[in-house]
Amino acid sequence: MTTPSGTETGTPPTAAGGVGSVAEFEVGLHLLADDPSLTFVAFVAMVLLAAISVRFAFYAARNRRASVGTGDGVLWESLLAVGAVATVYALVGVLEIVTSIRATFKQGVLLAVVLLLALAVREVYYNAALSTDAEGRSEFRGRRALELAFVAVVAVVVFGIAALGLRRELLALQGVGALVFAGYGFHFGRRQTAAAMVQGTMLDSLLRHLLPVLAFATLVPAVDLATVAGLDRVVVIHLQVVFVIMTATALMTATIKLRQNLATL
């Protein structure tokens, strides 16, 4: 990430603390990798993601209120959490640019977004399975322990990096975790899209808008595996900014879908 002075490091620290020094807090522009162009693009990307995430959470909350009694509450709550946590991630990214705050655990927050998206995709399939598959409920009960393990991975990454810094082991766990979470979500997405009985339904349409968000959001924390492999961290951060923009773009189309769905309720 960046040093307290705002200069991007070429290799990840292995033992330095992750949250920076509160005593040296300053408000002002802090360049990423001493690169004004990268800093500007990153700032725009984070502001864009924050604005879209707030809107996404807003429409998820409205859909939840409009769907009371329909059995879709958990799905809308998952999507509301996606928007809320993505907003936190984006705002932290903005603060890293306009203040001396250094939240090296930031990508761990996006890892939580990836997990929430995967669980939302699972919930889409779960809701459809209850209406088309009598065995759907019992199948999902056996997955709770696995999902709790996923939550534990997110906690280890966020709090581990916050306390210990960008250790290679934690970056590896973050990257692998993102890929595993995405695989979990895409497993249910594939099963959903292959089910002829639910094709063309609201749930099917929503799923097809969520999968691109899941794919692009996964790449942001997953690309840190390149850091572990020895790629210059400045290059990795350039890639992460690109993937943040792609995530925001995909989330915007999903937000439009939530707004359209609200009009049909």
Please report, for each region that a protein language model flagged, where it lies by residue.
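Helix-loop junctions on the outward
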Residues: 24-31, 65-68, 88-106, 223-235
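Hydrophobic alpha-helical transmembrane segments of multi-pass membrane proteins
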Residues: 48-56, 71-97, 152-157, 208-228
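Individual alpha-helical transmembrane segments in multi-pass integral membrane proteins
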Residues: 38-52, 74-134, 138-145, 171-181, ...
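Short, strongly hydrophobic alpha-helical membrane anchors
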Residues: 1-37
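Short, flexible domain-boundary/linker segments around small modular repeats
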Residues: 54-72, 159-162, 191-196
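Membrane-helix boundary elements
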Residues: 25-40, 152-175
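Membrane-interfacial loop-to-transmembrane alpha-helix junctions, especially the N-terminal start
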Residues: 66-82, 139-148, 201-210
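C-terminal transmembrane-bundle signature of multipass membrane proteins
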Residues: 54-57, 90, 110, 114-123, ...
